[in-house]
């Protein structure tokens, strides 16, 4: 399960790096499709930074944290981090929809990635707390396979 998180984290980091690159670029955005889909407008708007820090850089840091927590199997902290990321993504989505009236393809992909991570984190915590992990570990012990604690 944790490797699925890592794959999603890599996808989120890639789109965040692309958005960060675009934030500092003066060239036309490759994802500027029409007046409703323009990454350039979104990434150069006043909402693209928080206290001078690009939102895309915050995304990179968030995805990195989520990746580390997944690899360490820190389910509760992973769930908290993904819920915080989801709340931040919803805040940014609201700005795109209601304030700017323009969508960024990179941002929408990142929003989908953090939503998937959050759903997986919820599922992982529920699965683990249901006792399924303990039953799996007992079964593996019977057949001679071992797995580190925390599954």
Describe each model-derived feature in a short phrase.
Residues 1-149:
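Membrane-interfacial helix-loop segments of redox and metal-homeostasis proteins
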């Amino acid at each position: 399960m944790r490797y699925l998180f890592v794959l999603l984290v890599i996808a989120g980091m890639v789109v965040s790096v692309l958005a960060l690159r675009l934030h500092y670029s003066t060239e036309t955005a490759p994802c500027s499709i029409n007046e409703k889909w323009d990454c350039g407008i979104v990434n150069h708007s006043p909402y693209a930074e928080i206290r001078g820090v690009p939102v895309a850089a915050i995304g990179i840091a968030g995805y990195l944290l989520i990746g580390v927590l997944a690899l360490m199997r820190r389910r509760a902290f992973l769930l908290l981090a993904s819920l915080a990321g989801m709340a931040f993504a919803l805040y940014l989505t609201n700005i795109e929809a209601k304030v700017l009236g323009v969508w960024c393809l990179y941002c929408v992909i990142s929003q989908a990635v953090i939503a998937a991570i959050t759903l997986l984190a919820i599922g992982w915590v529920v699965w683990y707390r249901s006792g399924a992990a303990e039953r799996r570990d007992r079964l593996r012990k019977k057949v001679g396979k071992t797995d580190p604690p925390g599954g």
